[in-house]
Curated annotation (Swiss-Prot):
InterPro entries: MeTrfase_RsmB-F_NOP2_cat (IPR049560), MeTrfase_RsmB-F_NOP2_dom (IPR001678), RCMT (IPR023267), SAM-dependent_MTases_sf (IPR029063)
One BP term from GO: tRNA wobble base cytosine methylation
PANTHER family (alphabetical): NCL1 YEAST -RELATED NOL1/NOP2/FMU SUN DOMAIN-CONTAINING, TRNA (CYTOSINE(34)-C(5))-METHYLTRANSFERASE, MITOCHONDRIAL
Protein name in the entry: tRNA (cytosine(34)-C(5))-methyltransferase, mitochondrial
Length: 367
């Protein structure tokens, strides 16, 4: 058995022994089968060739380094976002003993950036170790949520404070809504999703992690996010637009060539949808409020170009530079791309820092 497989099984034994009072218990034989026999992802050559043409032009050498990581799923790292509303007895100690460290506390402790004092805890490992997800059980709160740690950047950029009214415009499957609740207790967290299946998934996620005593703070809706700004103008202090995008990791492993070709054709329509969602978010936020726009693609057309076009057409909005301390405090673990134009921040996967892609841009509504 390889060292990574041994570490995986050791971590499972440790974590699940203290989980859910036995509800998630599973034999080591089953776990080994789950880990070793997991089918390999099937690469879509059509999408890869398209990405090679586009990203080699937009990102240069940075693309070829990211490409090596994206083509090797066994190298991908996974973050463990802890649920502060659950019983975490022994869990943090177990993770620490296995070599996990807290992403937001392990580097630059002298920094006074906005990450310094928030209760959010995400543990990461230097190796591509992945513990299994926990099963959903009615009435029991899960202890952790597995995610690409770079997906926390939009939530950190949003910088939610106690009692603020927050809108997560495209919320499913719910990881960023959950992360928001780990940073502060909002006065209201409105989680919206337009797709019925993903809306149901969102509901299940919230039920699995949020205690009944706090669910009155949540509003979960099934609406077209493009209409919310008109329906609720100026209603929110902070708005997150984690926009539908050409998810680079997923699209590379599209199940068949025909579907890959279909997605690439649909890709040209995404920037218009993204701009409309961002404009809706700006209408929904109050003057002085913050909107964060994010995607999980490296595409310039879906990232910088969307933000630039909205800034040019929407009066009373300013692009905010993310604090350098904020970037510095995470640079030991995330690789930030050199963007042209320099609008927002983009994390791209690199060897040893396999997090991303994740683009984030922060906007402030002046009036």
């Amino acid at each position: 058995m390889s060292g990574s497989s041994f570490l995986f099984l050791k971590s499972i034994k440790c974590i699940l022994s203290s989980s859910c009072h036995g509800q998630n218990t599973i034999s080591n034989t089953q776990l080994a089968a789950q880990y070793i026999s997991k089918p390999q992802k099937q690469l879509c050559e059509t999408v890869l060739k398209y990405f090679d043409r586009q990203y080699s032009e937009e990102l240069g050498e940075q693309w070829w380094n990211a490409r090596d990581v994206l083509l090797n799923p066994l190298s991908w790292q996974y973050g463990v976002l802890l649920n502060r509303f659950s019983d975490l007895t022994n869990l943090k100690q177990c993770l620490a003993e296995l070599g996990y460290t807290n992403l937001l506390q392990q580097t630059h402790p002298e920094s006074h950036s906005q990450t310094a004092d928030i209760p959010l805890q995400c543990f990461i490992h230097p190796d591509p170790v992945r513990i299994p997800t926990q099963s959903h059980h009615t009435g029991w709160l899960k202890q952790y949520y597995l995610l690409n740690a770079a997906s926390l950047l939009p939530v950190l950029a949003l910088n939610v404070q106690e009692g603020e009214n927050v809108l997560d415009l495209c919320a499913a499957p719910g990881g960023k809504s959950l992360a928001i609740l780990q940073t502060a207790t909002p006065g209201l967290l409105h989680c919206n999703e337009v797709d019925q299946h993903r809306h149901d998934w969102l509901l299940k996620t919230l039920e699995s992690y949020v205690p009944p005593s706090l669910r009155h703070l949540l509003s979960v809706t099934l609406q077209d996010g493009r209409s919310i700004g008109t329906m609720q103008p100026g209603a929110y202090d902070k708005v997150l637009v984690d926009a539908p995008c050409s998810n680079d990791r997923s699209w590379l492993y599209t199940p068949d060539t025909h579907r890959g070709e279909m997605w690439l054709k649909e890709r040209t329509q995404l920037p218009l949808l993204q701009k409309e969602l961002l404009c809706s978010a700006l209408a929904a936020v109050r003057p002085g409020g913050i909107v964060v726009y994010s995607t999980c693609t490296m595409s310039r057309a879906e990232n910088q170009s969307v933000v630039e076009e909205v800034l040019a057409s929407y009066p009373g909005v300013e692009l905010q530079e993310l604090e350098q301390q904020f970037i510095d405090s995470l640079s030991d673990h995330f690789c930030f791309a050199h963007l042209h134009p320099s609008v927002g921040q983009l994390v791209i996967p690199q060897k040893g820092k396999t997090w991303g892609p994740m683009y984030v841009s922060q906007l402030k509504k002046i009036y």
